Amino acid sequence: MKNLVAPSILAADFANLQRDIEMVNNSNADWFHIDIMDGVFVPNISFGMPVLKAIAKHAKKTIDVHLMIVDPDRYINTFANLGANILTVHYEACTHLHRTIQAIKTSGMQAGVAVNPHTPIAVLEDIITDLDIVCLMSVNPGFGGQSFIENTYKKTNQLKHLIEFTKSGCKIEIDGGVTNKNANALIEAGANVLVAGSYVFGAKNPTETIADLKNSIG
């Protein structure tokens, strides 16, 4: 399975958003990772539909939307209509997770589930074969620029074994604190998609940083 890099738009310069979108378009990155936060499920508020619509208008790569919100079912069709290709919801935010996953797929998007750092992988056993992607939070969700949680390597490996055992075929995405210092170890543990925010957009040369990260993971 190809290893992918997904710059997180949460870390972009919102006064120069189109510039940063074009940078990602012209880089070696594979996806746009877009965090939607409601100030309820997580303490922070990021951005909503108008910003996503503007991003989708210019983005030329896969749009990977990560919902950190309560009751995500309310907006599934809206995100599909706005151009999201992948929609990931949090295990901790869904009352009827299987129904939510089926609704995402019915709307034409790939379906993902995110789990917080201290949520065990075992909660995914009954749903893993329905998923296209699992997003492991390697920081506590809600803010960019946090330090990487070391237990992520163990969880990634556990998830890899679950996917292999069930023949699910879904991707493993790591979100939070990803840099060139931990990228290879994450891929070796079983990850396929690395989300990088502050590491990319805080760099002097984001395009070069993406290229280096992409080259390092093959």
Range-by-range predicted roles:
Residues 177-189:
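Acidic, divalent-metal-coordinating active-site segment for phosphoryl/phosphodiester hydrolysis
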